[in-house]
């Protein structure tokens, strides 16, 4: 996967929320008084006299950096703001409130955030009523440092208290003083908050928050906290509700989904190491749910019961994203990755034995401190043997506060870049060979919007196959809509996508397509990313596994 891959660039680019979203049920959590909502909308109660002209509702924009966890949380931030009376800003307009949901995994995430904050400073000076809020992992890490570097910011909040955003914005407006509120522990599951979803046809469902691993390169556990699992009943209730709204595909999110069941928030629920496999099977019993994905598992805890559930559950997609990080056992030890290369390859072998057509993708880090040419050669060897459908490759980024930042042997940039390019070239050749093997085959595609960067030029539409591959196809008829399901035949292959110019073989209209036509958003949504291919905008894998 080249450096232009969505997962490699996700911390460099913010994904703004835009467009209308599905209505959500009333929210009764910690937000500003709903009187603000009524006043903003110009509504007066019975007996209040003649209608009084009110100021228009304040508009907002959420800019998202980083992983699927952040995309999920940003949908909750948008839902909270709309429940408090804010209105989503239209594309191209200047929002009254700009919220940055930040990433702290790589150094260029910091640089990009503070660069964008600097660009907003003139707007803030010209319009003091505009508000800027910074949340997410970088805010949790930097805390008061955000205001030192960007004193025009109005609100700083962390990963554990996103439900406080509307209250903090109102308090900052009233007191004319910046508000900083960083909670040290999870206050409530983000999934319990109102949501303004990014898609009519695909949804994120968080099954846990936090991580109990201690990878030396990763700062996420110190920012998200130790793992806390939602109850299966709550998760399945959310999935059923989404399906009732027309959603066809859900992605189950966790920093380490294999560990689900050992840290339930409800003390009445016993530890259950088989809980994740059971959850997958339970999703298979939900009528109308066509696709289930999950991200991401940890190789050290990947068990055969999960492989069996994947193979035997009708709607679990034949796709697995399992981070490798390095093919060198010596580097894996230095990373505190509690598995070795042969164990990883053994898991892949068992997955392919049970699901021969599974598309397996991974994450790789190049240039970890102390990595020798021999270590890097071991990574290349594992990549050749594993035959990944795609590999999302990152150059090691030194993060203050992580053990790896203190290690000797930090590599020169030129060495890391040269190895990175060699790895990219190898993986792209493997990806191309795998995709060429699909030419002539029929694929089922869940039609998306915005996944193809040149769709308007080529007159193609785009979507994802069941295995996550990106497919650009010629519809040949105007009735195909985002959210519909089609089958088509692959006519051409590239490393990052398939082309299907043979026309649509079958077309099934869906309620999700109806919802999209009725006014759902027209922006890019990764269908259970990480998938295989290059959508316009996508999120990187959730933290570090």
Curated annotation (Swiss-Prot):
Primary location recorded for the protein, binned into one broad class: cytoplasm
BP GO annotations: tRNA methylthiolation
Record: residues binding [4Fe-4S] cluster 1: 67, 103, 137
Residues reported to bind [4Fe-4S] cluster 2: 211, 215, 218
Domain TRAM: 436-504
MTTase N-terminal domain ranges (all copies): 58-174
Disordered: annotated span: 1-32
Assigned protein family: Belongs to the methylthiotransferase family. MiaB subfamily.
The protein, known as: tRNA-2-methylthio-N(6)-dimethylallyladenosine synthase
Species the sequence originates in: Mycobacterium tuberculosis (strain ATCC 25618 / H37Rv)
Recorded name of the encoding gene: miaB
């Amino acid at each position: 996967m080249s450096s232009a891959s969505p997962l490699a660039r996700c911390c460099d680019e913010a994904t703004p929320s835009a467009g209308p979203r599905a209505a959500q049920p009333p929210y009764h959590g910690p937000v500003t008084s709903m009187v603000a909502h009524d006043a903003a909308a110009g509504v007066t109660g019975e007996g209040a006299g003649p209608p009084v002209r009110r100021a228009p509702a304040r508009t907002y924009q959420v800019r998202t950096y980083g992983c699927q966890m952040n995309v999920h949380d940003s949908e909750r931030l948008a839902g909270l703001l709309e429940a408090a009376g804010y209105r989503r800003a239209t594309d191209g307009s200047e929002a009254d409130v700009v919220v940055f949901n930040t990433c702290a995994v790589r150094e260029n995430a910091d640089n990009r955030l503070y660069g964008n904050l600097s660009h907003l400073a003139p707007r803030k000076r010209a319009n003091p009523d505009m508000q800027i809020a910074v949340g997410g992992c970088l805010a949790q890490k930097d805390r008061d440092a955000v205001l030192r570097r960007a004193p025009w910011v109005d609100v700083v909040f962390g990963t554990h208290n996103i439900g406080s955003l509307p209250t903090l914005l109102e308090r900052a407006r009233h007191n004319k003083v910046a508000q900083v509120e960083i909670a040290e522990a999870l206050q409530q599951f983000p999934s319990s908050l109102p949501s303004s979803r990014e898609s009519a046809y695909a949804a994120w469902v968080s099954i846990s928050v936090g991580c109990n691993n201690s990878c030396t390169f990763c700062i996420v556990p110190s920012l998200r906290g130790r793992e806390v699992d939602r109850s299966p009943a709550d998760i399945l209730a959310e999935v059923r509700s989404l399906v009732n709204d027309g959603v066809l595909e859900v992605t189950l999110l966790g920093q380490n989904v294999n560990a689900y069941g050992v840290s339930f928030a409800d003390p009445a629920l016993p530890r259950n190491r088989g809980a994740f496999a059971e959850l997958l099977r339970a999703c298979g019993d939900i009528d109308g749910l066509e696709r289930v994905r999950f991200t991401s598992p940890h190789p050290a805890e990947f068990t055969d019961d999960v492989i069996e559930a994947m193979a035997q559950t009708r709607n679990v997609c034949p796709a697995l994203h399992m981070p490798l990080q390095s093919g060198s056992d010596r580097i894996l030890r230095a990373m505190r990755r509690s598995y070795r290369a042969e164990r990883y390859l053994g898991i892949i072998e068992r997955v392919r034995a049970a699901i021969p057509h599974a598309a397996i993708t991974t994450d790789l880090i190049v240039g970890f401190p102390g990595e020798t040419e021999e270590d890097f050669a071991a990574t290349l060897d594992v990549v050749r043997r594993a035959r990944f459908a795609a590999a999302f490759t990152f150059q090691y980024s030194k993060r203050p506060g992580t053990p790896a930042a203190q290690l000797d042997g930090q590599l020169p940039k030129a060495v890391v870049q040269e190895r990175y390019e060699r790895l990219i070239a190898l993986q792209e050749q493997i990806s191309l060979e795998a995709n060429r093997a699909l030419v002539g085959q029929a694929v089922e595609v869940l039609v998306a919007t915005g996944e193809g960067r040149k769709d308007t030029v080529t007159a193609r539409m785009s979507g994802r196959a069941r295995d996550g591959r990106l497919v650009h196809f010629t519809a040949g008829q105007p009735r195909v809509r985002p959210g519909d399901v089609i089958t088509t035949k692959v006519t051409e292959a590239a490393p990052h996508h398939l082309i299907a110019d043979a026309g649509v073989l079958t077309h099934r209209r869906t309620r999700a397509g109806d919802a999209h036509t009725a006014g759902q958003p027209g922006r890019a949504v990764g269908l259970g990313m990480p998938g295989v291919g290059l959508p316009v905008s996508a999120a990187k894998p959730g933290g570090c596994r």
